[in-house]
């Protein structure tokens, strides 16, 4: 009986994931408020059903009380966040919130399957991060001072990376973090956010060549410190954020092209300088033949293949034998027991989140906020690409974790912080839209108030005849009046953008 339930559950889980992913993209393009509300409600029901089915199956398989505890804690978090956001931040993006809850649900499910202790540790970090970051949307919305701290962001980011380079301990061939009183901190996760804020502040008003050079020098210092720490995966994330922000700010293709050329040359140099980079390239070329170097990639590929399209079912596979399955290779563990179709939907869900962030960036009227959203979205997409691309042998492994899914406190905190900033930007854009809508309605009311009452009663043909007669006598005055009645082109465009934004 238990085996039948397990086998049926994997098809139901796959179906729920497919429906949630499709609904996520549908909500992005849906303009009707009521229909989008129904989509969001259906998504919440799917999240609850998926958690219930997965944790129920795991309890049937193991019979551990800790599984029930993790289910209750996960449900308390998801429902609590949904309720609090709707009470406090009514203008927040519920699409982004639902995507975050689904990704966190997948994380809690697979971590509970692999290690209940790590799942509990991850949950504590998640809860603390959410509480700490709950005020971030207010700071972004009201904090006009954020755009004036440009060089503080630069100094703070360089200082954090320098501390790790000097005092950090080596893991996987790279200096990634420092340890204080038994607690590990990966400061590069915070530095990638401060770098984006620095570049946005530097280029928010003046995107001249001089400011581009300043931004390039500071970004290069960040990247060079990471290279010296042999943390090349994070260095690539920083570099991609730099390239995209520079291009969006200047609209000049030569800057990213020069940057990509320099990065290509740096990759070649890194290959000859660092032995762990050569080992990862060798594993990428032949994971089976280089089993003596590491079995991570080969075990991950075996796990995904053994799961097939629908997976083996929870506790029916062996993802626990994959090295670092809770971190770098968590995507392989998910595909093994939940299926390749589930994994494809996970990729599409991450893509939906990225598109949503980019859409928010495009709707921002102020360049500072636009560049922040664009930079953070680029970092998120780059992390997803590096993690999944490395585990499926598309690119060499980089040691980057999957945001919101992989085990890791610093990564979890920085991602929750990043999404809280994005929510603040979305709320700010909604405020701007409402303000412009009020101005437009006020303008219409004033125009209606200033129109003579006789003009409303006059028939169209009489009005036309009257304008013809008056036009011949006072053509200049009529022309000036007509010019005054024409709306300003800039204001018309702003109103049009506001209307589209409100629909979106």
Predicted regions mapped to residue ranges:
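Alpha-helical transmembrane segments
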Residues: 18-25, 81-83
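TM-adjacent membrane-interface loops and short helices in multi-pass inner/ER membrane proteins
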Residues: 287-331, 340-342
């Amino acid at each position: 009986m238990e085996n039948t339930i397990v086998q049926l559950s994997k098809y139901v889980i796959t179906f729920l994931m497919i429906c949630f992913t499709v609904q996520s993209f549908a909500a992005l393009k849906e303009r009707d408020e009521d229909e989008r509300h129904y989509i969001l409600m259906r998504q919440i029901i799917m999240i609850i059903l998926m958690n219930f089915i997965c944790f129920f199956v795991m309890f049937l398989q193991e019979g551990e009380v800790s599984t029930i505890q993790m289910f209750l804690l996960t449900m308390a978090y998801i429902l609590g966040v949904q309720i609090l956001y709707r009470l406090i931040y009514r203008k927040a993006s519920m699409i982004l919130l639902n995507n975050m809850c689904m990704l966190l649900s997948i994380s809690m499910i697979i971590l509970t399957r692999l290690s209940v202790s790590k799942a509990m540790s991850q949950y504590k970090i998640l809860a603390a991060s959410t509480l700490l970051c709950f005020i971030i949307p207010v700071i972004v919305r009201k904090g006009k001072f954020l755009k004036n701290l440009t060089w503080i962001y630069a100094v703070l980011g360089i200082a954090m990376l320098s501390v790790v380079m000097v005092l950090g301990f080596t893991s996987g061939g790279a200096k990634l973090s420092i340890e204080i009183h038994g607690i590990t901190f990966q400061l590069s996760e915070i530095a990638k956010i401060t770098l984006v804020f620095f570049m946005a502040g530097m280029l928010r008003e003046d995107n001249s060549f001089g400011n581009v050079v300043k931004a390039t020098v500071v970004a290069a210092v960040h990247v060079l410190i990471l290279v010296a720490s042999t943390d090349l995966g994070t260095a690539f994330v920083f570099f991609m954020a730099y390239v995209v922000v520079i291009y969006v700010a200047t609209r000049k293709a030569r800057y990213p092209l020069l940057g990509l050329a320099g990065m290509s040359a740096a990759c070649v140099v890194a290959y000859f300088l660092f032995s762990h980079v050569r080992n990862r390239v060798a594993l990428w070329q032949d994971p089976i033949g280089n089993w003596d170097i590491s079995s991570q990639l080969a075990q991950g590929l075996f796990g995904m293949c053994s799961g097939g399209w629908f997976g083996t079912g929870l506790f029916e596979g062996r993802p626990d034998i994959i090295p670092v399955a809770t971190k770098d290779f968590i995507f392989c563990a998910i595909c093994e027991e939940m299926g390749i179709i589930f994994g494809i939907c996970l990729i599409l869900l991450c893509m939906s989140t990225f598109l949503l962030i980019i859409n928010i960036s495009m709707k921002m009227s102020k360049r500072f906020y636009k560049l922040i959203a664009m930079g953070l979205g680029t970092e998120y997409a780059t992390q997803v690409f590096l993690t999944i691309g490395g585990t499926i042998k598309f690119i060499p492994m980089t040691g980057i974790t999957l945001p919101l899914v992989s085990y890791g406190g610093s990564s979890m905190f920085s991602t929750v912080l990043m999404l809280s900033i994005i929510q603040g930007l979305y709320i700010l854009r909604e405020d701007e839209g409402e303000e412009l809508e009020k101005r437009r309605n006020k303008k219409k009311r004033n125009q209606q108030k200033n129109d003579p009452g006789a003009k409303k009663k006059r028939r169209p043909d009489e009005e036309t005849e009257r304008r013809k007669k008056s036009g011949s006598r006072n053509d200049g005055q009529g022309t000036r009046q007509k010019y005054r009645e024409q709306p300003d082109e800039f204001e018309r465009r702003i109103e049009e953008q506001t209307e589209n934004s409100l629909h979106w």
